[in-house]
Amino acid sequence: MIPIQLTVFFMIIYVLESLTIIVQSSLIVAVLGREWLQVRRLMPVDMILISLGISRFCLQWASMLNBFCSYFNLNYVLCNLTITWEFFNILTFWLNSLLTVFYCIKVSSFTHHIFLWLRWRILRLFPWILLGSLMITCVTIIPSAIGNYIQIQLLTMEHLPRNSTVTDKLEKFHQYEFQAHTVALVIPFILFLASTILLMASLTKQIQHHSTGHCNPSMKAHFTALRSLAVLFIVFTSYFLTILITIIGTLFDRRCWLWVWEAFVYAFILMHSTSLMLSSPTLKRILKGKC
């Protein structure tokens, strides 16, 4: 049990972090969206950033409402918010993974014909790949939607005589739904790891070919991408830790530690959101022109 003053402190920190992320996401969407309307085209990285900004904006509001409903035991409201949070959470994971793939194919210096063909195909079909990530999210959220309906049914049956066999089956399916949500995040995480490893291999190759100490534009691009990927890796790892804590949550009072953990995780997400703003040449150029 932690002191109430400390709980309130971390609650305030979490809210401030969340509001900052919401403002940053809104700024990314507004600036790049205006640029899109003016020039009628955007680079693939800016397409990802707009999509990620919209997804993260919705995710952050859903996360705040979800956490407060969980803390104050508003179960009926929580059930309706959970499915929204899970949808945008999975979508954000996929968009982050696509961002690492873009960094990999754009910055890496591999010259193998298969890699060059993949680079050409991915860049050409990037809008369809974004749409595909949305469709994959819609499909993977189906078990969660069913589990959400089951959870509502369990809540309505709470004060009624229950059929123990039916209840056990419903609760078991709800556990499978949680496992399916975890698996849905593993695939983009593996995609992220593969892209990061390829990018690190490309950077190592560049260092071996340019050992004179001079930092050419290609090297700077590698370091910029790796810095963003390093922060993103921390965010991914932190989120998987939250899943682990959820699984072993019976070991301690999760309501007491909820705001401490949320403030810790969203500090990294705030760092990543800031890094995304700095990774877009279009966004930096427009913001510098406004100053």
Curated annotation (Swiss-Prot):
Major subcellular location class = membrane
The GO biological-process annotations, alphabetized, read as: detection of chemical stimulus involved in sensory perception of bitter taste
What is one GO cellular-component annotation here?
membrane
Residues in a coiled coil are: none
The GO molecular function terms of this record are: bitter taste receptor activity; G protein-coupled receptor activity
- Per the record, ranges on the Extracellular side are 1, 63-84, 147-182, 250-257
- Which keywords fit this entry according to its UniProt record? Cell membrane, G-protein coupled receptor, Glycoprotein, Membrane, Receptor, Sensory transduction, Taste, Transducer, Transmembrane, Transmembrane helix
Q: Where in the cell is it found?
A: Cell membrane
Topology within the bilayer:
Multi-pass membrane protein
Q: Which residues lie on this side of the membrane: Cytoplasmic?
A: 23-41, 106-125, 204-228, 279-291
Give the sugar-modified residues.
Answer: N80, N163
Tell me the InterPro entries matching this sequence. TAS2R
Which top-level group of life is the source organism from?
Eukaryota
> So where does this one cross the membrane?
2-22, 42-62, 85-105, 126-146, 183-203, 229-249, 258-278
What Pfam families does this protein's entry cite? Answer: TAS2R
Could you tell me what this protein does? Receptor that may play a role in the perception of bitterness and is gustducin-linked. May play a role in sensing the chemical composition of the gastrointestinal content. The activity of this receptor may stimulate alpha gustducin, mediate PLC-beta-2 activation and lead to the gating of TRPM5.
Q: How does it assemble?
A: Interacts with RTP3 and RTP4.
The family annotation for this protein states: Belongs to the G-protein coupled receptor T2R family.
User: Extra info from the record?
Assistant: Most taste cells may be activated by a limited number of bitter compounds; individual taste cells can discriminate among bitter stimuli.
How is this protein named in the record? Answer: Taste receptor type 2 member 16
> Which organism does this record belong to?
Gorilla gorilla gorilla
Q: Which gene encodes it?
A: TAS2R16
